[in-house]
């Protein structure tokens, strides 16, 4: 494949933007390959500015659960644009999406729309602190909750890709109120609560960690968090920005049958447009302005384009959609295991619904430390070879791959064959 147009575009971009990108992972640094500039998408395919075609498993990092350029979503967005892009006042589209979210997520009795997942998590922490009158938040090593100061501590995803354990610029006074413990380790949580329980406002967790690859919770972990937060009067916060409506029809909390106090959403609920949301029990949510004293606001929060796109996206998801995802996911998971075994290369495949992660190690992978044991050099080689075969994978070991309703069994079979071909060149 040729990338001459992407290389020229990146050279210009580096003159204009830090690193030439507006989000670090797009620089493709961890896979030692030139950044790829995309032109358009269609269904399960994405096309770069050099004309190369790929089966897309990035899907804009998760939001495009229906695939690219879904006809119904695009039509409704066009209708919304014809009326105007933003009004600074409420619209009926906000009511429609809010009602659908509340209907699908039983733990959410009221919801507040924002413009990004980072906004959702930082506002949720302020709400948790204001509601409980406490200061400390517990998060898990390798879980990424956006780039707000108090959560950019021992995060996964982009900072892991760049080899940064933490980000400079986070004040010590803020960092001291964030307690970090290993993911899937209930004993560590118990120790944290024994020492700081009276001042812990909440525990925030990705119910499926999607920013250290894909790492599902071990049996009893999420329920254990529910039990200990209840015992200490702290709030359990599920960051479902990635897992929301991707792991299951009722999100990860429905899939695992564990009810949080507050939930953060994003990605899928915008259908590819910028969006975030957080919600929970009425008694907690009513503490937010204008009904309460905890301030939160946003110029473009609930903007009609994102609300329309999100509503039309969620409207197309049914319980049967997730049966289809499981069918494709089973096929891809087993295919990966078989083809890597054929080439005598160790692999661990983790999956939760339409989220799939593979690690080039013998496993298991249940936490960030184990995820870091993956063969990163071979992962980079694999990425480059798969791109040559027309498969677009996340350019980072610490990101998951995603399925959409546009993917087919033929796509999966082609992808497995591509892995076979790639491995034959590498080993």
Swiss-Prot record:
GO terms for cellular component: cytoplasm. GO terms for molecular function: glutamate-1-semialdehyde 2,1-aminomutase activity; pyridoxal phosphate binding; transaminase activity. It is an enzyme of class 5 (isomerase). Pathway: Porphyrin-containing compound metabolism; protoporphyrin-IX biosynthesis; 5-aminolevulinate from L-glutamyl-tRNA(Glu): step 2/2. One of its GO terms (biological process) is protoporphyrinogen IX biosynthetic process. It catalyses: (S)-4-amino-5-oxopentanoate = 5-aminolevulinate. This is Glutamate-1-semialdehyde 2,1-aminomutase 2. SUPFAM superfamilies: PLP-dependent transferases (SSF53383). InterPro entries: 4pyrrol_synth_GluAld_NH2Trfase (IPR004639), Aminotrans_3 (IPR005814), Aminotrans_3_PPA_site (IPR049704), PyrdxlP-dep_Trfase (IPR015424), PyrdxlP-dep_Trfase_major (IPR015421), PyrdxlP-dep_Trfase_small (IPR015422).
